[in-house]
């Protein structure tokens, strides 16, 4: 289709999008065939530039504040018109995709991008259905115009770029953002607002399925191990980041994966390594003179990424969904070295730790966080993406856990034997052994030891894991120092939890002083 002197490229194939991206100088090919691009000064999400339009459907339903920022409806209309006119004056790319693999819960999306590579990214991450919108639902529009420059005083934005969600108009406006992760997370936020109304829990988690049909969920913030641990050659991958849990089903919202690449190795992450080939996109990965990716080079960012479609994963759930989960795992990266490698949680503890979302920002995906590592609490293990009040999601989680009798575990992928800089981080093979024990059912009804202060129950034995690693206190040379660190962590938990209005039983399920 042609508009004036420019072309609108609609539903191009992967090969065609790669060809267009190369011809337009948007990227280069790595020796694996993956398209390599740079995203400029933004190499992660920009939370301060994310807004939701305030209108009757959102006014009283959203937890407004520094995460969910209000944007006026009239300003949105004016800015959308400006961005659309700018985009229509040049070549651009349109693809029709779905968000949500379950037939009852998919959103049909018209994705318009200024660049070929961001359209390819969307084709990697969203679902490319055999038939678009068979149920004839109202269509969402994503308008992603990377080279538009917002004017804050005129447009009402915070900077030269923005991500604005308009639920009333079913529109997502992304302007001035070359980091493509904004697009996938914007549609995740849309589903996170809509799904609870259908009694479906939206989750920032990975999911895989065993030979017997048993499903495991992996909740966690970026860098805690969701993508790595769910990419298991002995199981079938459902997805690595965004899922919905309804009665009888866990379904992927996406059609691809978005893996962190820092220190990626074929030995530790063979599934991801093999997926980075023709049709994949590498963001901010440095190539050597032979076009070989150097995943140890963080000169552009610690948040280098690979986007690839699920078709690049040999062992995957063809239906992109599974049954309800036998095991629910909360991944936390504990910088203090206080938490054990695995704890078995009851329902109240599950609610407490889900609401707390304790972890560390590791090579953070957010702009402005730098390369440093710091502890954080992120409600629902994904606070930036959940627009409703946190309690609504926690109630749905408990309802789902109770309904299916899912077992819940807290798994520490962070430090032991001392805090960051003193102790050592649990190795990926150790954590994989913990996960394997959970999935085998070995920890169901296991004999446990109670850890005071942090108020957790630890199995006394885990197949494949050294027994001395299980109780973190035994790993510290200075036991008094451990006790002080545990009290310090407990204080952080208690202080953070004051903002939640929940039952006394849930409050009592957390660390106690």
UniProtKB/Swiss-Prot annotation:
<keyword id="KW-0067">ATP-binding</keyword>
<keyword id="KW-0547">Nucleotide-binding</keyword>
<feature type="binding site">
    <location>
        <position position="185"/>
    </location>
    <ligand>
        <name>ATP</name>
    </ligand>
</feature>
<dbReference type="InterPro" id="IPR001272">
    <property type="entry name" value="PEP_carboxykinase_ATP"/>
</dbReference>
<protein>
    <recommendedName>
        <fullName>Phosphoenolpyruvate carboxykinase (ATP)</fullName>
        <ecNumber>4.1.1.49</ecNumber>
    </recommendedName>
</protein>
<dbReference type="InterPro" id="IPR013035">
    <property type="entry name" value="PEP_carboxykinase_C"/>
</dbReference>
<feature type="binding site">
    <location>
        <begin position="220"/>
        <end position="228"/>
    </location>
    <ligand>
        <name>ATP</name>
    </ligand>
</feature>
<feature type="binding site">
    <location>
        <position position="204"/>
    </location>
    <ligand>
        <name>ATP</name>
    </ligand>
</feature>
<dbReference type="Pfam" id="PF01293">
    <property type="entry name" value="PEPCK_ATP"/>
</dbReference>
<feature type="binding site">
    <location>
        <position position="185"/>
    </location>
    <ligand>
        <name>substrate</name>
    </ligand>
</feature>
<comment type="similarity">
    <text>Belongs to the phosphoenolpyruvate carboxykinase (ATP) family.</text>
</comment>
<comment type="pathway">
    <text>Carbohydrate biosynthesis; gluconeogenesis.</text>
</comment>
<keyword id="KW-0479">Metal-binding</keyword>
<feature type="binding site">
    <location>
        <position position="269"/>
    </location>
    <ligand>
        <name>ATP</name>
    </ligand>
</feature>
<dbReference type="InterPro" id="IPR008210">
    <property type="entry name" value="PEP_carboxykinase_N"/>
</dbReference>
<dbReference type="GO" id="GO:0006094">
    <property type="term" value="P:gluconeogenesis"/>
</dbReference>
<feature type="binding site">
    <location>
        <position position="431"/>
    </location>
    <ligand>
        <name>ATP</name>
    </ligand>
</feature>
<keyword id="KW-0312">Gluconeogenesis</keyword>
<dbReference type="GO" id="GO:0005829">
    <property type="term" value="C:cytosol"/>
</dbReference>
<dbReference type="GO" id="GO:0046872">
    <property type="term" value="F:metal ion binding"/>
</dbReference>
<comment type="function">
    <text>Involved in the gluconeogenesis. Catalyzes the conversion of oxaloacetate (OAA) to phosphoenolpyruvate (PEP) through direct phosphoryl transfer between the nucleoside triphosphate and OAA.</text>
</comment>
<feature type="binding site">
    <location>
        <position position="241"/>
    </location>
    <ligand>
        <name>Mn(2+)</name>
    </ligand>
</feature>
<keyword id="KW-0210">Decarboxylase</keyword>
<dbReference type="GO" id="GO:0004612">
    <property type="term" value="F:phosphoenolpyruvate carboxykinase (ATP) activity"/>
</dbReference>
<comment type="subunit">
    <text>Monomer.</text>
</comment>
<dbReference type="GO" id="GO:0005524">
    <property type="term" value="F:ATP binding"/>
</dbReference>
<feature type="binding site">
    <location>
        <position position="204"/>
    </location>
    <ligand>
        <name>Mn(2+)</name>
    </ligand>
</feature>
<dbReference type="InterPro" id="IPR015994">
    <property type="entry name" value="PEPCK_ATP_CS"/>
</dbReference>
<feature type="binding site">
    <location>
        <position position="305"/>
    </location>
    <ligand>
        <name>substrate</name>
    </ligand>
</feature>
<keyword id="KW-0456">Lyase</keyword>
<feature type="binding site">
    <location>
        <position position="179"/>
    </location>
    <ligand>
        <name>substrate</name>
    </ligand>
</feature>
<keyword id="KW-0963">Cytoplasm</keyword>
<feature type="binding site">
    <location>
        <position position="185"/>
    </location>
    <ligand>
        <name>Mn(2+)</name>
    </ligand>
</feature>
<feature type="binding site">
    <location>
        <position position="305"/>
    </location>
    <ligand>
        <name>ATP</name>
    </ligand>
</feature>
<feature type="binding site">
    <location>
        <position position="45"/>
    </location>
    <ligand>
        <name>substrate</name>
    </ligand>
</feature>
<keyword id="KW-0464">Manganese</keyword>
């Amino acid at each position: 289709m042609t508009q004036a002197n420019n072309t609108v490229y609609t539903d191009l194939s992967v090969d065609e999008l790669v060809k267009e991206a190369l011809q337009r100088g948007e990227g280069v090919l790595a020796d694996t065939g993956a398209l390599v691009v740079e995203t400029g000064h933004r190499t992660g999400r920009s939370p301060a530039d994310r807004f939701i339009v305030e209108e009757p459907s959102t006014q009283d339903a959203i937890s407004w504040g520094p995460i969910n920022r209000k944007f006026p409806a009239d300003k949105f209309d004016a800015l959308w018109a400006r961005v659309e006119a700018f985009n229509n004056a040049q070549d651009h790319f349109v693809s029709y995709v779905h968000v949500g693999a379950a037939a009852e819960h998919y959103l049909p999306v018209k994705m318009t991008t200024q660049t070929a590579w961001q359209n390819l990214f969307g084709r990697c991450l969203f679902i490319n259905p055999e038939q678009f919108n068979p149920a004839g639902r109202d269509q969402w529009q994503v308008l992603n115009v990377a080279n538009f420059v917002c004017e804050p005083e005129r447009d009402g934005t915070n900077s030269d770029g923005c991500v604005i969600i308009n639920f009333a108009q079913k529109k997502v406006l992304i302007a001035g953002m070359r980091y493509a992760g904004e697009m996938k997370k914007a549609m995740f936020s849309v589903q996170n607002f809509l799904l609870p109304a259908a009694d479906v829990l939206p989750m920032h988690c990975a999911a895989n399925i065993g030979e017997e049909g048993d499903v495991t969920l992996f909740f966690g913030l970026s860098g805690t191990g969701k993508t790595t641990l769910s990419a298991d050659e002995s199981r079938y991958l459902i997805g690595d980041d965004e899922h919905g849990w309804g009665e009888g089903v866990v379904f992927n919202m996406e059609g691809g994966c978005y893996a962190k690449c820092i220190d990626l190795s074929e030995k530790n992450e063979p599934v991801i390594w093999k997926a980075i080939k023709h049709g994949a996109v590498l963001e901010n990965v440095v190539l050597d003179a032979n076009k070989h990716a150097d995943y140890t080079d963080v000169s552009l960012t610690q948040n280098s990424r690979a986007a690839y479609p699920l078709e690049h994963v040999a062992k995957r759930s063809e239906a992109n969904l599974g049954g309800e989960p036998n095991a629910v795992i909360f991944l936390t990266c504990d910088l203090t070295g206080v938490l054990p490698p695995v704890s078995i949680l009851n329902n109240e503890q599950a609610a407490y730790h889900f609401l707390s979302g304790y972890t560390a920002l590791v090579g953070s995906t957010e702009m402005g966080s730098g390369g440093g590592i710091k502890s954080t609490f992120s409600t629902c293990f994904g606070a930036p993406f959940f627009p409703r009040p946190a309690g609504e999601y926690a109630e749905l989680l408990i309802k789902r856990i109770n309904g299916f009798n899912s077992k819940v575990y807290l798994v520490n992928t962070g430090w032991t034997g001392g805090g960051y800089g003193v102790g050592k981080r649990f190795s990926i093979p150790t954590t994989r052994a913990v996960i394997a024990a959970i999935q085998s059912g070995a920890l169901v009804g296991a004999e446990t030891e109670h850890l005071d202060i942090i108020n957790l129950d630890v199995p006394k034995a885990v197949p494949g894991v050294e027994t001395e690693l299980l109780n973190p206190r035994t790993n510290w040379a200075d036991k008094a120092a451990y006790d002080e660190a545990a009290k310090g962590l407990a204080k952080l938990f208690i202080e953070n939890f004051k903002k939640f209005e929940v039952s006394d039983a849930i409050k009592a399920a957390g660390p106690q002083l």
